[in-house]
A protein has these predicted regions:
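Eukaryotic intrinsically disordered, low-complexity regulatory tails and linkers enriched
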Residues: 2-29, 36-39, 100, 109, ...
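Short helix-loop-helix/strand-helix junction enriched in hydrophobic and basic residues
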Residues: 115, 130-150
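Alpha-helical solenoid scaffolds in large eukaryotic transport, assembly, and signaling factors
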Residues: 129, 147-302
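C-terminal catalytic region of ATP-dependent kinase domains
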Residues: 250-252, 257-368, 533-680
Length: 680
């Protein structure tokens, strides 16, 4: 009797239907779902009220009513305990070992307790996923035990880089490591979880195997995520780099360098600060990865040089980075090195002249003399564009709190000459820079759904930065209070040939961009002067001093959707508003697939030196923010319901927002000026 007949006999003796047992349980998010975003019980869908309170399940982290989460039990060690936020104190968690959980999680917990031996055995056996699928047909208990293992394995794919894996999860990944070739996401999870107990030779063998790029298993057989790809994504490479054992290995570093080279140079340019931070932990990363990667591309050369220059403001980092930077410059042509230092001197020269408070005529003579002596100078954020002069008559000092200067630079590139207006702000602009990096990634990831107008930001010191101003744009404050018109009329006046339908279709993209960007970044202090509208009707946010849910007025920070924006879409009951909501949901789904990327990008707030708001943006704060906003691991339907609910809620102007706008208008009237306006 062959194997298939044996399996069939076993199934017959069990006297059960295969279809009811064979499906793998859905993965649970294993995150603490924020209660303020949930209005209905996850199970029975009853609306919460004073009489129907919210309760978290300590395993899946979802929110239920007291009836649907009335089970209590001790959570097995195989299951990751869903931890509440630090500020969420419960006396029961100290007094009792038992934890509240929902009915589904409790039944799973009970099964894991009974079948822990089978789970441990099947986890440690050297079986492929295909063999595990076959063994499930032997009997019910084996089937459920293997399904539990597969459920844990699928759950690993939704964990953030900062979330610790259990021993069982690490074991599953390591046992199946040779099945992950050409599935870069799973390769990254496996390598990033490599632990001290394994031999270095095993790591090197695995790296060499992955380097052969042999595909043995398709995505369906190893239960990959939908966005699985043989090509690396930035967050996947950086997650591997976070493992100290892996990054300390020479073979691994060379393999990582080859994978970095597969990325676009524009993407590498954006993550230079993260690479420098990695190099400061492991100097060999500078020599084996960063210097070879950056020394062959002009834009990367400029980006690395000026990022190092900024990090070196910190005295300790100055001594650490000086030999690294010298080694980097030795690799470059002497003419490129001269150009780098010329640009650095030009930035210092402009800032020094601002502090001298020169007259416009003095400005012109000083800049012209400098350029005539040293020649045209390349811009620090774009080496292909050179500054050839300054339009001194248009130099302006804005009448806002920090008195920023507008410096109009005459520049030349392959498209000819033009004026680029630079706003020199006397405050830390690194949060603005981070937001622009996030915006650029959003444009790539949600292509077709969003259209974010981005601009260059260059931090000079921790108290000064240059911002490239967007041409032909006005604040929504000016449109409403200065021009005395609506957003729709303003755009139509500037674009007389556009139809209302075409205008609204175009506006949907920019409105979705505005909402998802502000939501994922937790952007606060959103008033009408911080939202610009370009000539062709694009919304553009500026001034990102308050992020991750901070707001100077202590308002709840979610999205800024004004009454004018809703009217532009045709009103809350219009077809275009419904398309806008649907596109917000689609963009949100795409963003959630890259949750690890957003976590890694926001980690800049924690490691950037000199420190940004010291001790405020800890790893825990960033992790909790990403979990609250993106719900990694939660199913798409539940997450979509949350984002649509937030869009609907934000579209209705609250009395607190009206008061905030009114006080802002009074403040503006008193100083009789508006910020960052460029007349059309």
């Amino acid at each position: 009797m062959n194997r298939k007949k044996n399996l069939s006999m076993s199934i017959m003796f069990e006297n059960r239907k295969i279809s009811n047992e064979i499906s793998i349980p859905k993965t649970t998010p294993s995150i603490w779902i924020p209660s303020q975003n949930i209005s209905k019980c996850y199970k029975c869908k009853d609306t919460f009220s004073i009489w129907k309170r919210k309760h978290h399940c300590r395993i899946c982290g979802r929110i239920f009513c007291s009836y649907c989460a009335d089970e209590w039990g001790i959570i097995p060690s195989l299951i990751n305990l869903t931890s509440p936020p630090d500020n969420n104190f419960s006396l029961n968690s100290i007094l009792y070992k038992e934890r509240r959980m929902c009915k589904d999680c409790n039944s799973q917990s009970q099964f894991i307790k009974k079948s822990s031996l089978y789970i441990y055995i099947f986890t440690n056996l050297p079986l492929t996923f295909k063999e595990l699928y076959d063994i499930r047909l032997v009997n019910k208990e084996w089937c459920k035990a293997i399904n539990t293992i597969l459920s844990f394995y699928k759950g690993v794919q939704y964990k953030l880089p900062c979330q610790e894996l259990t021993k069982l999860e690490k074991k599953v990944l390591w046992n199946h490591r040779f099945e992950f070739s050409q599935h870069f996401f799973l390769m990254s999870k496996c390598l990033s979880s490599f632990k001290n107990g394994e031999k270095i030779s095993a790591l090197e063998q695995l790296i060499l195997f992955y380097n052969k790029k042999i595909t043995h298993y398709d995505c369906k057989k190893i239960a990959c995520r939908r966005n699985c790809s043989p090509s690396p994504k930035i967050e996947e490479i950086l997650e591997i780099c976070s493992n100290e054992i892996v990054i300390s290995n020479k073979i691994a570093r060379l393999w990582l360098l080859n994978n970095f080279k597969l990325l676009k140079s524009s993407e590498i340019k954006m993550i230079i600060p993260w690479l420098i931070n990695l190099g400061l932990k492991h100097y060999s990363v500078f020599y084996d990865i960063i210097i070879p990667l950056c020394s062959s591309n002009n834009n990367l050369i400029y980006s690395f040089f000026f990022e190092c220059d900024f990090f070196m403001i910190d005295k300790i980092l100055y001594y650490k980075l000086t030999p690294i930077l010298n080694r980097f410059l030795q690799k470059l042509d002497s003419n490129i090195v001269k150009e780098l230092y010329k640009t650095l001197d030009f930035v210092k020269f402009i800032n020094e002249n601002i502090f001298l408070n020169l007259s416009n005529s003095k400005w012109e003579s000083q800049v012209n003399n400098w350029i005539s002596e040293r020649g045209p100078v390349r811009l620090p954020w774009d080496s292909s564009t050179v500054c050839i002069g300054i339009a001194s008559e248009a130099i302006t000092v804005f009448n806002s709190a920090t008195k920023p200067w507008k410096i109009p630079l005459i520049v030349r590139n392959k498209n000819g000459e033009k004026i680029v207006n630079i706003l020199v702000k006397f405050e830390d602009v690194r949060k603005d820079k981070l937001t622009m990096i996030v915006s650029k990634f959003l444009n790539n990831i949600c292509k077709g759904l969003v259209d974010i107008e981005t601009y260059n930001i260059f931090p000079v010191y921790e108290t000064c930065g240059w911002i490239e101003m967007v041409e032909k744009s006005s604040t929504m404050y000016d449109i409403k209070h200065k021009y005395k018109t609506t957003l729709q009329n303003y755009i139509m006046d500037l674009n007389p040939n556009i139809t209302v339908k075409k205008m609204r279709e175009k506006f949907i993209k920019t409105c979705v961009s505005s909402c998802v960007l502000c939501y994922v970044m937790g952007v606060g202090d959103r008033h009408l002067e911080n939202i610009l509208v370009t000539k062709d009707g694009k919304l553009l946010h500026i001034d990102f001093s308050y992020i991750l849910g901070d707001d100077p007025k202590n308002l709840k920070v979610e999205m800024k959707i004004t009454e004018d924006m809703v009217n532009m879409l045709g009103g809350i009951n219009s077809k275009f508003y419904n398309i806008f909501k649907e596109n917000c949901s689609l963009a949100y789904k795409k963003m959630r697939l890259r949750s690890s990327l957003w976590y890694i990008l926001l980690s800049y707030l924690n490691f950037s030196l000199p420190s940004i708001d010291a001790f405020k943006y800890t790893e825990l704060v960033i992790k909790n923010h990403i979990i609250e906003r993106l719900l990694p691991g939660e199913n798409n339907s539940e997450a979509s319901m949350q984002i649509i609910d937030i869009v609907d809620r934000s579209s209705k102007t609250s009395w607190t927002q009206n008061i905030a706008e009114f006080t802002h208008k009074i403040s503006n009237t008193l100083r009789e000026a508006t910020q960052f306006n460029m007349e059309l």
